[in-house]
């Protein structure tokens, strides 16, 4: 028993993981990545693509430390103490290049779609282990949207928060509760200090407001501001559809007339 206890203590001291982590997609980029000097954040991402293509890309480019699939499998990409290129143009509390002081976790899925509990549990267990290892409080477990920012462009004249909605669902109170996180960032220090401006008002409400569902106010029509409620053709179809009539199969279709023409198709504008 004493030998077992000593071995267990040695295991903890070594920083070895208690989670089953696969090295199948461990990146060949590890050898060229420098050791990270500090770890202040855990950044959660969504891949916005299926598992296999995401894992292949992450492995090839070394763009995350871990990837968690829909079935809860955890893959190591870049060793946790090395720099992974996951955050891109980023800022947190005045410090740029978040890659230099964070661990990045890619989660197979999409920023506006709920994840199954088997995946949520795997993310939760990994996050909790990393929190203990690096002494990271709940409010510094953030999503990519919290730290990414955009450079000035034709739609935004200043550096702005809103370049990415990646990982946005991990800011929602209900999802954070599932992850065992009791606190979240209270406000955007970089916007408050006027280092950045708000480029996506809907995203701001998700990250720091009370929005807790994608369905309640997610924009339906792309726009330069991205925070504006959309209506467009979908709303017109819903508003003009009548109840189905079994005797007349066309009765449920929206009624088009000179007085009630359908709206023109929305002009798609690239997001800032």
Regions from the language model: what does each represent?
Residues 19-22, 110-272:
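Basic/polar, cationic surfaces and motifs that engage anionic cell-wall
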Residues 18-137:
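Active-site-adjacent loop/helix surface patches within enzyme catalytic domains
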Residues 1-7:
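Sec-dependent signal peptide recognition
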Residues 8-17:
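Hydrophobic h-region of N-terminal signal peptides that target proteins for export
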């Amino acid at each position: 028993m004493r030998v077992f206890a000593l071995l267990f203590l040695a295991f903890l001291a070594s920083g070895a993981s208690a989670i089953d982590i696969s090295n199948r997609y461990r990146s060949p980029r590890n050898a060229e990545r420098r050791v990270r000097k500090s770890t202040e954040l855990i950044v959660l991402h969504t891949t916005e693509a299926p598992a296999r293509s995401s894992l292949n890309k992450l492995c090839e480019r070394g763009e995350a430390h871990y990837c968690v699939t829909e079935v809860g499998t955890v893959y190591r990409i870049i060793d946790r103490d090395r720099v992974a290129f996951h955050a891109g143009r980023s800022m947190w509390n005045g410090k740029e290049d978040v890659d230099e002081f964070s661990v990045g976790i890619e989660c197979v899925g999409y920023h506006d779609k709920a994840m199954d509990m088997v995946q949520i549990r795997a993310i939760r267990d990994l996050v909790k282990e990393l929190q203990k290892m690096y002494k990271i409080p709940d409010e510094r477990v953030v999503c990519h949207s919290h730290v990414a920012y955009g450079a000035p462009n034709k739609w935004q004249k200043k550096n702005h928060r809103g370049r990415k909605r990646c990982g946005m669902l991990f800011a929602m109170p209900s999802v954070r509760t599932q992850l065992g996180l009791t606190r979240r960032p209270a406000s955007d220090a970089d916007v408050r200090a006027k280092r950045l401006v708000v480029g996506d008002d809907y995203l701001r409400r998700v990250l720091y407001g009370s929005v807790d569902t994608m369905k309640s106010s997610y924009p339906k029509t792309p726009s330069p501001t991205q925070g504006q409620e959309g209506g467009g053709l979908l709303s017109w179809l819903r508003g003009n559809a009548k109840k189905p009539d079994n005797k007349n199969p066309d009765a449920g279709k929206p009624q088009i007339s000179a007085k009630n023409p359908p709206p023109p198709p929305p002009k798609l504008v690239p997001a800032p």
